[in-house]
Amino acid sequence: MNKIRNSTYFIFSCVVSLILFIPNLIKSTIGSDWDSYALIGTFYNYDLVGLYTPSRPPGFPIYELIIGIIFKVLRKGSLLSPEQGLLIFQFFLVIILNFIVYRFINKSDQKNYLFYLLIVFSPMYLISGGSVIDYFLGAIFGFLAIYMVLHKYSSNYIYAYLAVLLSLSIGIRLSNAIFLIAILLYITIYKKNYTLSIYTAVLTMLLSCFIYLPFYANLYSFYTVNNIYNSPSEMICLLNLTNTDHTFIDRLGRFVLKQINFFGVIGFVLFLMLIKNARTKITENNFIFFIIFILFQFSFLRLPTEEGHLLPAFISLLLVFSNMKNFNSKILIATLTFTFLSNFVDFKVYSVNSIDSASDISLNASVTKGFFIEDYELRNNIALEKEFHYKNSQSTLFDAWKNGCPN
């Protein structure tokens, strides 16, 4: 009976996700961010021109390839539009990540499923999950690797399973190497299995190289033929991020504000009240999640743009708190309620001069549309000219990369 009752949380979350997914499916809108369209442009340049032009440095080859193939196949004629096919694929990823998070909660001592709902009903979780972007697929493989090392450690050939999962996660997004670092530290410090650490590290790096090198070699070949680069060392520019010309204060402002967006203003205040007396020690069970949280936060501080990059940190932090005792249940329920409501209506206590830089912040209380509603309207407006965005992303990416790295 307990298993049936506990699984209700997972089923309920999937039903809510489905309800919120349907409007986007009907409208066939793949996202409010240009990056969603850039993925298609990357695939078309590779498929039609024979040149790999990353949608963003340093490239996201596995996800770009998957999205491009789905788009191309459905473009030839199907009951579904290409956009609907991509959205259905993305929805399955949401269900899979929901289940992985649910399993972590279910394996914990406290089994606090309200934290599970707090994770999966966060506006940034729902928006990222409903957008054609790489965050969810990369997180799925990363957290599967964590699940294996925590709960399937005695499996035969675990180093091979870990290497495959981690290399897939890294092949989707290079910054997911943080999952590898956290797992290696855990195996070394708590399991003291240095052989497993070495095997996992070496095999993961080899497999990751097999994923990235063919695409990078394609781009380097183009540069050498056109006398743009003469040495492979010049390709290190692929690791440089774009749009980093902001002051530390600018980045810090954006960094702080985007943390709030996971809960909404009221939800964030309630969350701080909830955890203000929380005390926890780093243990074998939560060490990996602490490392994931810290390293992804530092990575985000370098370029605090899309909140989706913080999803592993957000999930990890709440998984740590979910296994702690003596939380005020009323405040936790209130936090969950207002976090979910912030998808539809949000109470702002500040305004910024620019969403992207947030260099000037003023106190200004107002009630605004929620994050999910704002994203829904924006993606609908962008989709009105989706054919333009597909073609424009292809030409824009080619122009950006044809003379060398754009950064």
Predicted regions and their residues:
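Loop-to-helix entry region of an early transmembrane alpha helix in multi-pass inner-membrane enzymes
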Residues: 57-61, 65, 75-96, 128-131, ...
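Membrane-lumen/periplasm interface segments of specific transmembrane helices
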Residues: 197-250, 256-267, 342-346
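Short acidic/glycine- and proline-prone juxtamembrane loop motifs at membrane-interface regions
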Residues: 34, 56-57, 127-137, 305-307
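Hydrophobic, aromatic-rich transmembrane alpha-helices
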Residues: 2, 14, 188, 257-287, ...
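Membrane-embedded, lumen/periplasm-facing catalytic core of multi-pass transferases
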Residues: 39, 335-407
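Membrane-interface alpha helices of multi-pass inner-membrane proteins
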Residues: 116, 158-173, 181-184, 206, ...
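Signature aromatic-anchored transmembrane alpha helix within multi-pass, membrane-resident enzymes
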Residues: 9-14, 113, 160, 164, ...
